[in-house]
């Protein structure tokens, strides 16, 4: 099913039993986080807090709190179907030339579909039903969560930040958290390699004395939100990709203060500017690592206009030690990454980002090994091929007889197929998430690759072990007599 706006999605989730309305009064200061955290860890529904303490605006949380809801938001019925989205992105990232006239004709509908998904700009839109400007702008009227006891203040956690670099047609969409520091001031915490930060840096170099226009959408439709966190090729805009997910063109409307365009159905839109040299210390905040991050300087976004739908819904989340909502998103998007990696490295069988590894800091890869040193090539490929993995600290590579998603299998491979000195690759002075306080320098640290594959001649001079396995014939004979043995053990009985 496709969703034109956030309200369509909320309505469908409620019909499916995937959303719970909370009518009791709940405080956005800490209480919502505790309720959301307990619910998410139990695999529970999305939560719509209808009576946040001190506010008359409902709060939607845990929207993507299960992989199933992520898949639904992408217009799919289950997580497995996300592989097809990954295949589409892999093709768009590096399209294969047609093998002949027939192949070209078969691929033509896909190219037509992409071309038809350019956004549609409307003259008016629901997101501009109510307009608040200048001195009437007051971010404190929005029920922004204060998530953890040690947080520096309220934090906007699901902002869809819309930017454009100088002389660029393509707009960038990104999710960058924002600390509220005044009635019209937010700290824009974007890392230097992210699209929004790159747009800003280019603008500032070209226009050192001019304010930089920014728009922020809160509560867009699910396809647009998820498009902003998916590895979309640079040649395709997130708005166009959202249209592909939805099956219809993304509807936009011109912002009032700049040439940016915002999602027409968004619940709330913030418009304003980042002024030259306007910086502020951001944090500390509890983060997806399970720790409070250190304080650092980031640009300040001055909000000069707020527009919203009638009776708007504020979309929020929290981040903390996994599993949290970003970790769940990582589990689902893992399925999108696999075909993209396999397009470049066909030898990869599976790729897994364990949520307990903060969704991106550790990767397990299984592969069909073809020559000595092959595992190291795959390690380097993971680190360099997609921007999403430039901060991955640990890459474990195993053979395809190992289940990448089963730690018992992975640990067995590490402890039986690795020599620590020979099979560990250390790379120093590489980009590292600045939130990683374990690195010796902020933003710069090392990476470790672990070759847990069976070793080939040239990698070892010793006779290599053969894994123990029972014959299929014996397994079948035992299956046939199992019921007569009287052994009642869950999991031991044949299917």
Curated annotation (Swiss-Prot):
NCBIfam families: PRK10922.1, UbiD family decarboxylase. This is 3-octaprenyl-4-hydroxybenzoate carboxy-lyase. The lineage of its organism: Bacteria, Pseudomonadati, Pseudomonadota, Gammaproteobacteria, Pseudomonadales. Its EC number is 4.1.1.98. It is an enzyme of class 4 (lyase). InterPro entries: UbiD, UbiD-like_C, UbiD-like_N, UbiD_bacteria, UbiD_Rift_dom. Binds 1 prenylated FMN per subunit. It is found in: Cell membrane. GO terms for molecular function: 3-octaprenyl-4-hydroxybenzoate carboxy-lyase activity; metal ion binding. Homohexamer. Catalyzes the decarboxylation of 3-octaprenyl-4-hydroxy benzoate to 2-octaprenylphenol, an intermediate step in ubiquinone biosynthesis. It comes from Marinobacter nauticus (strain ATCC 700491 / DSM 11845 / VT8).
């Amino acid at each position: 099913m496709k969703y034109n706006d956030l309200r369509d999605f909320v309505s469908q989730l409620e019909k499916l039993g995937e959303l719970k309305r909370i009518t009791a009064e709940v405080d956005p200061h800490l209480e919502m986080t505790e309720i959301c955290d307990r619910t998410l860890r139990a695999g529970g529904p999305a939560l719509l807090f209808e009576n946040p303490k001190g506010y008359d605006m409902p709060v939607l949380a845990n929207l993507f709190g299960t992989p199933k809801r992520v898949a639904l938001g992408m217009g799919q019925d289950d997580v497995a179907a996300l592989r097809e989205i990954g295949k589409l992105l892999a093709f768009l990232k590096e399209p294969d030339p047609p093998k002949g006239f027939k192949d070209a004709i078969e691929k033509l509908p896909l190219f037509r579909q992409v071309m038809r998904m350019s956004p549609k700009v409307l003259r008016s839109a629901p997101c501009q039903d109510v307009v608040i400007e200048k001195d009437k702008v007051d971010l404190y009227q929005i029920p922004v969560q204060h998530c953890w006891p040690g947080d520096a203040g309220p934090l906007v956690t699901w902002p869809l930040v819309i930017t454009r670099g100088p002389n660029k047609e393509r707009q960038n969409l990104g999710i960058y958290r924002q600390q509220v520091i005044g009635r019209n001031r937010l700290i824009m915490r974007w890392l230097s390699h992210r699209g929004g930060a790159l747009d800003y840096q280019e603008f500032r170099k070209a226009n050192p004395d001019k304010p930089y226009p920014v728009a922020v959408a809160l509560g867009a439709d699910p396809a647009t939100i998820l498009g902003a966190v998916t590895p979309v090729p640079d040649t395709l805009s997130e708005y166009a990709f959202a249209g592909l997910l939805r099956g219809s063109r993304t509807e936009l409307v011109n912002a009032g203060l700049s040439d940016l365009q915002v999602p027409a159905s968004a619940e709330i839109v913030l418009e304003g500017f980042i002024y030259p040299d306007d910086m502020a210390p951001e944090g500390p905040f509890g983060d997806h690592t399970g720790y409070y991050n250190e304080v650092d300087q980031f640009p300040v976004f001055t909000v000069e206009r707020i527009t919203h739908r009638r009776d708007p819904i504020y979309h929020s989340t929290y981040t903390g030690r996994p599993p949290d909502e970003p970790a769940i998103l990582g589990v689902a998007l893992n399925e999108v990454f696999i075909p993209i990696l396999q397009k470049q490295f066909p030898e990869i069988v599976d790729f897994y980002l364990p949520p307990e590894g903060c969704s991106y800091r550790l990767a397990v890869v299984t592969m069909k090994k073809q020559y000595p040193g092959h595992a190291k090539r795959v390690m380097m490929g993971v680190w360099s091929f997609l921007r999403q993995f430039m901060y991955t600290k640990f890459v474990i590579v195993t053979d395809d007889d190992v289940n990448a998603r089963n730690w018992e299998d992975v640990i067995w491979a590490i402890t039986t197929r690795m020599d620590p000195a020979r099979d560990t690759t250390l790379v120093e002075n590489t980009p590292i998430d600045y939130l990683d306080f374990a690195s010796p320098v902020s933003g710069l640290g090392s990476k470790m690759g672990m070759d847990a594959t069976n070793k080939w001649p040239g990698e070892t001079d010793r006779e290599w072990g053969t894994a123990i396995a029972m014959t299929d014939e014996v397994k079948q004979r035992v299956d046939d007599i199992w019921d007569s043995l009287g052994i009642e053990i869950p999991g031991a009985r044949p299917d």
